[in-house]
Amino acid sequence: MGEVIAVVGVGYVGLPLVVEFGKIFRTIGFDSSKYKIEKCRKGMDPSREISDIDMAMAIHSEYSDDPADLELADFVIIAVPTPVDEARIPDFRPLINASRTIGAHLKPGAVVIYESTVYPGATEEICIPELERAGGKVWQRDFFVGYSPERINPGDREHRLTNVIKVVAGDSPATLEKVAALYETIVEPGVHRCSSIKAAEACKVIENTQRDLNIALMNELAIIFDKIGIDTTEVLEAAGTKWNFLRFRPGLVGGHCIGVDPYYLTYKAEMVGYHPQVILAGRRINDGMGKYIAEHTVKQMIAAGSYIKGARVNVLGLTFKENCADLRNSKVVDIIQELRTYGVEVFVHDPEADPDEAMQEYGVRLLGWDDLPRADAIVAAVSHRKFNTLGAEDLSRKLVKGGCVIDVKSAFDPAVLNAAGLRVWRL
């Protein structure tokens, strides 16, 4: 294959595609962000997920913010965000804008492949009409469309683009085979073919909806067990001795996928006349966990004898999950905002997050570990590997005598912390 590949969006999803395809084909990474393009041209991943060595191995890759370069591509892969707005309604603006840009610069006969997560039917109902209007072209005559939902998991060093089966679909059997053949050049386990684009779209939203619901169940169990006076972690470890018990843990559910994608499915369900109940119930539970954790932090501080107004809390971790720099839709922010409503001073430390981005996105100033004050409580919100070396002595130095540790991810041994005179509560 001597084709030219273009990838629109060089973020967490798009850049791995540019790098892997760029080892084989001429591959153009396109983004409207000049900052991202300049970083990539220097051989650096703006998100720090891909090493400089891997970036350098993509000898056929190039980067551009000029949409005219898209006219060179035989395949154009779209990997832009699909968020929800404040009312939790799908926000298609990034996808629509990308489709318009591509449609205006589409090579005759090109295949456009969408990787962005959408509800079943959105590619054909929303995206393809934008491609046609922008370029005055006719679908299935002048261009063709495929779909292959992204499965990138930020911070995961084991499950990567090249070793996870890729689901593919096309607007015709011929397009499907072209899309399958393209991805088979970089994905070692191969591809799974779907008979329709809608089926592939549905596949992605239920992958994340299933996980969201399982975590919601764990969160609800954690709330119940806390009221009963049972340690959730102990219960889950005991239940996990049965072969078919699913090993999920309670926690915050944020990020660009799990906390967002279910709303795409429920939106479509409402469109076709069905009001989903289980999915939305799970979303309500997970969306409320930041407030729940903040309330328990306050209760623990009161029990320890702290005055709440003017109390200090150190929060460890701001990213939406461990071992990555991604701050999108972080639910740690819910904890911070709720604590501030009580008059608590909150200080945040995250060695993975970008300080400028934290300030820009959330107005949160990140401090180094040494700059954290002695506080009434520590909320261990994100279990980065870099926090694994922290022991009871380290935590004690950042707490007043008898201070509280709120261990969201059960990362610390409560017996060790109790022995050091620390009060511990964990989800």
Positions of predicted regions on the chain:
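Structural/interface elements that position substrates and couple domains in central-metabolism enzymes
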Residues: 1-427
